[in-house]
Amino acid sequence: MSFFLTTPTAIDLGVNIDHVATLRNARGTAYPDPVRAALAAEDAGADAITLHLREDRRHIVDADVRALRPRVKTRMNLECAVTPEMLDIACEIRPHDACLVPEKRSELTTEGGLDVVGHFDAVRAACKQLADAGVRVSLFIDPDEAQIRAAHETGAPVIELHTGRYADAHDAAEQQREFERIATGVDAGIALGLKVNAGHGLHYTNVQAIAALPGIAELNIGHAIVAHAVFVGWDNAVREMKAIMVAARVAALHGGR
């Protein structure tokens, strides 16, 4: 358990290891090993390990999930689509958390949040199936009031707000608008009694404002850490991200939001 979990400045870092697997799969080798990366990330201060088992297995594969589960020392957060196959795998593996995400085979990366409003019955059934298996459920959604309310009504105890539009904003004004949507979404989730996480597209120079939001419990970050590790090493990349997040939270608590 992280030291930061016991302090008022608590904000967790979930390190996503998907793109360690992307690098491995680019040449069809056995290295780099995502499990080794996960364990090293934990040693460097990660509070959770996130991995996305996509239907097309483009990066993480079933063997990675099965190998990691008994070895993870923090929490395993398995991202998966709302499909019978993926739900069955999640119930069998029983990660600490399962984050339900939308998925399209044609996308380069996840393009938006899960449409809980439009697929309410299926999502609610998935939440029950996972909860019955002892898995805590998170829903990856856009910072939209209707989606947040619907997520709460499914019985999911956790939401992860999609920060991709904030991260991909073309100018400062657009980024500020998206930031305000996220901040409002955090407040809405907390008001409903939900644990609120966030992630997607966050990196070393845009994470500060999001980490400063006092209601966010956890940020899930992967690609930026893998990329930075090319230059500074894996341990340093993880430690730097965690330090940036905590510093932003401390500054916000001392200076106000």
UniProtKB/Swiss-Prot annotation:
Site (Transition state stabilizer): E160
Disulfide cysteine pairs (residue numbers): none
GO MF annotation list: pyridoxine 5'-phosphate synthase activity
EC number: 2.6.99.2
Enzyme class of the recorded protein, top EC level: transferase
Keywords tagged on the record: Cytoplasm, Pyridoxine biosynthesis, Transferase
Protein family: Belongs to the PNP synthase family.
Main location: cytoplasm
One Pfam family recorded for the sequence: PdxJ
Subunit (UniProt): Homooctamer; tetramer of dimers.
Purpose of the protein: Catalyzes the complicated ring closure reaction between the two acyclic compounds 1-deoxy-D-xylulose-5-phosphate (DXP) and 3-amino-2-oxopropyl phosphate (1-amino-acetone-3-phosphate or AAP) to form pyridoxine 5'-phosphate (PNP) and inorganic phosphate.
Protein name (Swiss-Prot/TrEMBL): Pyridoxine 5'-phosphate synthase
Catalytic activity: 3-amino-2-oxopropyl phosphate + 1-deoxy-D-xylulose 5-phosphate = pyridoxine 5'-phosphate + phosphate + 2 H2O + H(+)
Keyword flag DNA-binding: no
Annotated 1-deoxy-D-xylulose 5-phosphate binding sites: D18, H19, R54, H59, T109
Pathway listed: Cofactor biosynthesis; pyridoxine 5'-phosphate biosynthesis; pyridoxine 5'-phosphate from D-erythrose 4-phosphate: step 5/5
Listed PANTHER family: PYRIDOXINE 5'-PHOSPHATE SYNTHASE
One GO term of the biological process aspect: pyridoxine biosynthetic process
Gene of this entry: pdxJ
CC terms in the record's Gene Ontology section: cytosol
Native organism taxonomy: Bacteria, Pseudomonadati, Pseudomonadota, Betaproteobacteria, Burkholderiales
Binding site for 3-amino-2-oxopropyl phosphate: N16, R27, G201, G222, H223
Positions annotated as active site in the UniProt record: H52, E79, H200
Location in the cell: Cytoplasm
